Amino acid sequence: MRPPALLALFSCSAAFALMSEEIKEKVTPSQDLRQSSLPGRHDIDLKEIVFVIQSQSNSFHAKRAEQLKKNILKQAANLTQDLPRVLLLHQLAKQEGAWTILPLLPHFSVTYSKNSAWIFFCEEETRLQIPRLLDTLRRYDPSKEWFLGKALYDEESTIIHHYAFSENPTVFKYPDFAAGWALSIPLVNKLAKRLKSEALKSDFTIDLKHEIALYIWDKGGGPALTPVPEFCTEDVDPRCVTTFHSFLPLCGVPVKKEEIFVAVKTCKKFHADRIPIVKKTWAAQASLIEYYSDYAETAIPTVDLGIPNTDRGHCGKTFAILEKFLNHSHNKISWLVIVDDDTLISISRLRHLLSCYDSSDPVFLGERYGYGLGTGGYSYVTGGGGMVFSREAIRRLLVSSCRCYSNDAPDDMVLGMCFSGLGVPVTHSPLFHQARPVDYPKDYLAHQIPVSFHKHWHIDPVKVYLTWLAPSEEDQATQETQKDPREEL
């Protein structure tokens, strides 16, 4: 049975390009935003909400965020002359870790605490009904500490959350960013004070929404997430003030298979059990694919790069792949994808996704993690879900002096450090996954059209591929019906 997001692809993909039309709110100018006489309602103005769009600097994502900003302000202008502030996250600070939000809370506290009641966060594809949002926030006393959102929870303990709450993982709730989430100013002030007195302790940022919820909860010293039923990802209830439709971006014609080179990292001990899974599932979708190993086996065939296998890291092997691609492949091959031999990926969906990016730009794309972002550090694309490079990104990397400090260094982290030093940002896509489908909440995956998953551990990888990633009629319908979202920007 197909996941809900796949079943909705035909209708939702078309909706992706029509966001500005669908978001329009039917309101009358006579609606009074300054009065709230109902019992239990709190008198706040629209101008007391600071909107923060969790945007990215890549041109495609920045334009989508700018479009949402214009829509929010347009809705607001229909209601009041005192417009709210709408901020784009990637413009707020030059620091690498701005996307993790917590380092920005002291700035929010100093800048907005006197004249604001709420900081409302959302993603670039979140759709907002501004009058209803204001009405919803008026239910909560802005003088108290509130952490509001659509609640997600783990059905079983998972590695991406360090097996937190292993006895009963369902007890801890964290927000689905796609539905929007909000912090009251008193809570922002409290968190800002704490951040000034004690540094962020975690070295790694893996799942930001879970980690923010943990930090706010503070082992019971702070508020837990308050679920808000009006914060939605699917438009299933007339009360919804936010929605987030499933989408697989398509900006014109999908990238040709011949423009994508796929490099599979493997080693001799996995030739017999992992490579057959690759060939049985997604390999046929790739026009250009090679298997890079520590041992040349003609039956597969594998390519021996002359780099000894290591139990961890694989940095030497990855840089050898990058150099081989840049120096020995045709210039018309615009994209390199590096995956593990236990990565499950949809090349057809990747072709759709890459149509939204300019291969002449330095693009480094995948699921974004962070290391040491509270104290400098850098972002990186986690390798298991697949790392996507434009040719230009690889060229800039290899003309620099940044290289592995050892063959067994963690390749994805070294790449992140190198690209950070070069000023090439990681472009995040939540459609890539470092873990298995069972490691994510069902509600979270329900509004995705996934591109990849990772690991064969305790699953049937062929079944997972057929359920979540195999080409389908819905994917073909996307090509036939979806408009180029860039046309409206």
Swiss-Prot record:
Specify the pathway. Protein modification; protein glycosylation
Which Pfam families does the entry link to?
A: Fringe
Q: How does it sit in the membrane?
A: Single-pass type II membrane protein
Q: Which EC number(s) are documented for this chain? A: 2.4.1.-
Membrane side Cytoplasmic: which residues? 1
Function field: O-glucosyltransferase that transfers glucose toward fucose with a beta-1,3 linkage. Specifically glucosylates O-linked fucosylglycan on TSP type-1 domains of proteins, thereby contributing to elongation of O-fucosylglycan.
Give the protein's recorded name: Beta-1,3-glucosyltransferase
State the organism of origin: Mus musculus (Mouse)
Q: What is the lineage of its organism?
A: Eukaryota, Metazoa, Chordata, Craniata, Vertebrata
